[in-house]
């Protein structure tokens, strides 16, 4: 894990964490597609990974998904966390969600194998609300957003291990998002080699839904 983080830092030397097709897109999504690099310490990243590993190991990697959005993945939802992990997740909630936003009670955990990827998709409003926030563990990756009506408008987020990304508003509903497969994993001219990636994702409640669980499977975030 530490090796992946050092590699990402070498790749990113002198680079921003977000790049886009033009200044208008960067300005439009400045507060709606956000990356906080180094949100987790190495110790916190290790804490989350150790807690998740036993539950993830019981599942096989899958190569199709109920909505065909993910390849090479295993996933789970987790409601019970250790005290140390609860402190971390509370920091995520404070950083990403407003005081008037309610969150889905289970946290979505998605484990991509090194060859795994998430295809371009727009999350259904039935499954989560206007904001999602994800912690990236183990491997650097590149998330790409593309406007659904004007595909020449795009944004790329560089997600190193220990980073937090936040998507809200227009970035959620007007842009598709994906995690690039290894052979396409570039951030500008910088190659970002993919390894196994775990994301820990908090989601706001869908509009008009009370506290609890979504009625259908979670989105591929």
Curated annotation (Swiss-Prot):
- Where is the protein localized? Mitochondrion matrix
Identify the Gene3D superfamilies for this entry.
Answer: Alpha-ketoglutarate-dependent dioxygenase AlkB-like (2.60.120.590)
EC top class, in one word? oxidoreductase
GO-annotated biological processes = DNA damage response; fatty acid metabolic process; regulation of lipid storage; regulation of mitochondrial membrane permeability involved in programmed necrotic cell death
| Keyword Transit peptide assigned | yes
Residues binding Fe cation, per UniProt:
121, 123, 177
Q: Does this entry carry the keyword Metal-binding?
A: yes
Its job: May function as protein hydroxylase; can catalyze auto-hydroxylation at Leu-110 (in vitro), but this activity may be due to the absence of the true substrate. Required to induce programmed necrosis in response to DNA damage caused by cytotoxic alkylating agents. Acts by triggering the collapse of mitochondrial membrane potential and loss of mitochondrial function that leads to energy depletion and cell death. ALKBH7-mediated necrosis is probably required to prevent the accumulation of cells with DNA damage. Does not display DNA demethylase activity. Involved in fatty acid metabolism.
Its name, as the record gives it, is Alpha-ketoglutarate-dependent dioxygenase alkB homolog 7, mitochondrial
């Amino acid at each position: 894990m530490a090796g992946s983080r050092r590699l990402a830092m070498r790749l990113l030397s002198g680079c921003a964490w977000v790049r886009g097709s033009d200044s208008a897109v960067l300005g439009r999504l400045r507060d709606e597609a956000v990356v906080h690099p180094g949100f987790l310490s190495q110790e916190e990243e290790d804490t989350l990974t150790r807690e998740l590993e036993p539950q993830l190991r019981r599942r096989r990697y899958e190569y199709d998904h109920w909505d065909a959005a993910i390849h090479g993945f295993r996933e789970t939802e987790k409601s019970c966390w250790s005290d140390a992990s609860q402190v971390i997740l509370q920091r995520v909630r404070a950083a990403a969600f407003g005081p008037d936003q309610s969150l889905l009670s289970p946290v979505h955990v998605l484990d991509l194998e090194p060859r795994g990827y998430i295809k371009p998709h727009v999350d259904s409003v039935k499954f989560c609300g206007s904001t999602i926030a994800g912690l990236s563990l183990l491997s650097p990756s590149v998330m790409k957003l593309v406007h659904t009506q004007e595909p020449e408008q795009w944004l790329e987020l560089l997600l190193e291990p220990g980073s937090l990304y936040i998507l809200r508003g227009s970035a959620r509903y007007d842009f598709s998002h994906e995690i690039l497969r290894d052979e396409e994993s570039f951030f500008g001219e910088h190659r970002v080699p993919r390894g196994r990636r775990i994301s820990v994702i908090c989601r706001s409640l869908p509009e008009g839904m009370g506290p609890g669980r979504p009625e259908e499977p979670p989105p591929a975030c």
